Amino acid sequence: MLKMLSFKLLLLAVALGFFEGDAKFGERNEGSGARRRRCLNGNPPKRLKRRDRRMMSQLELLSGGEMLCGGFYPRLSCCLRSDSPGLGRLENKIFSVTNNTECGKLLEEIKCALCSPHSQSLFHSPEREVLERDLVLPLLCKDYCKEFFYTCRGHIPGFLQTTADEFCFYYARKDGGLCFPDFPRKQVRGPASNYLDQMEEYDKVEEISRKHKHNCFCIQEVVSGLRQPVGALHSGDGSQRLFILEKEGYVKILTPEGEIFKEPYLDIHKLVQSGIKGGDERGLLSLAFHPNYKKNGKLYVSYTTNQERWAIGPHDHILRVVEYTVSRKNPHQVDLRTARVFLEVAELHRKHLGGQLLFGPDGFLYIILGDGMITLDDMEEMDGLSDFTGSVLRLDVDTDMCNVPYSIPRSNPHFNSTNQPPEVFAHGLHDPGRCAVDRHPTDININLTILCSDSNGKNRSSARILQIIKGKDYESEPSLLEFKPFSNGPLVGGFVYRGCQSERLYGSYVFGDRNGNFLTLQQSPVTKQWQEKPLCLGTSGSCRGYFSGHILGFGEDELGEVYILSSSKSMTQTHNGKLYKIVDPKRPLMPEECRATVQPAQTLTSECSRLCRNGYCTPTGKCCCSPGWEGDFCRTAKCEPACRHGGVCVRPNKCLCKKGYLGPQCEQVDRNIRRVTRAGILDQIIDMTSYLLDLTSYIV
C-alpha cells in the first residue's frame, strides 16, 4: 500500500513538471515569466488542447491559408477555440482597413495581441496614457512600430499626421521590456523588431531593476492642462508661489495650495511671436526675478517678436529682453506700462536662440544667447548686433542712471577691451538649452557655478554639459564628462537640487533629454570631478504617478525642490502640458523639517513705488522722470517755452491760464472778455477762487 502511494505521488510530480514545461513551451528563457503572464481581464492564459489547435488549423484552411491568432500562440492563449482575433475588443475606426493591403495584414496581426498570454502587460503599462490617445494599440517593438507607421500612414487618414519618431515615442516600448509582436515572425528582424529577440537580456535587466527598485524616485503630477510650459521658477519673496511660463506668452501663478490663478501674472501674447512647429524655438523664452524683488518688484523677461521698425534689414525676428515692474495695486499681476527694453538682437533663424536669464549670487543679470545658426556671411549684414550671439552676457541692473538701463560690471573680462563687447562674460556657445545657477556651491574657490546644456545641433554626440567660467571660450570645449548618448533627443538642462524632501539627491545636477530620459551629475568633493548617475524613476509600487511626453524644461521652487515640465504634443495651442515634481518615496511628501512659513504676497511699499507717479523706479529706488516731468518724485510738469502772464504748467507743455489770457503759453490776451471795472474786493476774491478751483482740478 505504501509503495502504491509513493508511486502515485511520483506520477503526480512528473505530471506537474510536464504541465509546467508545456506551459513554458515557446516562451524562451523567461524564468519567472509565468508570474507575468496575464490576460486583459486579469486571468491567467489557458493552455490550448489538441482539439483547440486542430480547430484553429481548420479555420486557417478555410481562410485561404491566412495565419490566425491560434497560429501565433499555439500553446498558451487568451483566446479559446473559435474566438475571432479581434474579439470585439479593438473596435476602432483604424481597424476598418480590411482590404488586402500590407497595412491590413499588420492590423490583423495587431488584433491578435488580445490573444497573447501577455496581453495585460501589452495594453496596461504605466508608460502609457490611453485616455489621451485616439489609437488603442499594444506596446509595439521599435522596428515593428516604424514598419507599421510607414506602411499604414497612407491608409489611416487623420491618425498618423506626425513623424515616425513621435508616433513611436508613444506606442513603442522604450525600456527594452515586453512588446508586440511577442511571437516569431517570418521577416528579417532588427535588434528591436521582436520581443523574443531580446528576451534573454530582458530577464537580466529586470532582475537588476528589481534589486535597485528601492532606490528609485517618484514623480508627482502637480498641474495639467498647460500650453507648452517652458519654465517654472519662484520669486524669492517668501510667498512660495511658482511662476509657470507658457511658450505663447503667458506666465501663470501656482499657489502653495496647488491652485492656479485664473488671471495670468503676465500676459504679453500679443507681443510674442511663437513657433507652432517642432524645433521652432520662438516664443516666451525666460524670466528672472530681481534678487530684491520683494522690495522693488522688478522682473526681466526674454521673448521673440517682430516689430515694424525692424522691417528693414536681414532678420527673421527679434530676441528682446525687457524689464517689468509688478503692479502697485495687485502683487499677482505685472504692470505692462512699466516695460523698459534692455536688449534687442536680430535673429536670422528660428533655432539656437538661447535667451535664458539668470541672477547670480553676485547680483548681476546673466543672459545666455545661442549662436542663432549665423554664418560668417550673415555676420557682415547684422549691423553689429551679432557680436552678442553665442555669448553669456553679464549686466549690472542696479544703476541709478536714468538714461541707460544697465551698467557694465568692472570685473567683466572685456570691461576695457576694444575687440569684444564689454557685456560679454564668456562666449563660444552654440545651442544652449537651459542653464542654472547653483545656489549653494560647494567649491570654496568658486563663488559662481553656472551649468548649461549645449549642442552644435549636428548630432546627439555633440551634446555637452558646461560649467560657465569668466572669460572662457567654449567653441570647442569638451563636456564636463563623456556620457553615452541615451537617445537622439536634444539635452534639456536642469537644476542643482538643493531641496529637502529628496535629500538623497542633494547636490546633484538633475537634467535629461527631450525624449524623457533623466540623468544626474554629482561632483566629487575630493577630486572635483563630475560623475554621471542615472536617475531612476519608479512607475509602480510606492509610486503612483509616471512621466509621459517630451521634456520641455525643468523648474525649481523656493524650497529648492525640482520640477519637470512636459508636453505630449509640439503645438502651442494644445492644453496637454504638465508639471511634475520629483519626490522621494522613502520620505513624507512634506517632512516637518522641510516646512517653511508662507508669507502672503505684499504690494510694494517702498517710498519710490508710492510717490513716483510720473516716471519709473530704478531697482535701487531712484525715481526717473518721464519726458515732460521733473522735480522730486517727478511731481512738477515742464512746459517749454514756459507759461506766461501768471499761467501754471499743469501737464507737460500744457499751461493753465489766468482769466483773460489764452494760447499754449498763455501769451495771448482774450479780447472777447468784457472789461468791467470791479469796484470791490469781493469781485477779486471770486476771480481768484475760480482760478484756484480750475488749477486744483488739473492737479487732482
UniProtKB/Swiss-Prot annotation:
Entries under Pfam families matching the protein: EGF_2, Folate_rec, GSDH
Bilayer topology annotation: Peripheral membrane protein
PANTHER family for this protein: HEDGEHOG-INTERACTING PROTEIN (PTHR19328:SF27)
Annotated family: Belongs to the HHIP family.
Self-association state and partner proteins as the record states: Interacts with all three hedgehog family members, SHH, IHH and DHH.
Domain notes from UniProt: A flexible loop interacts with the SHH zinc binding site and contributes to zinc binding.
The protein, known as: Hedgehog-interacting protein
Gene giving rise to this polypeptide: HHIP
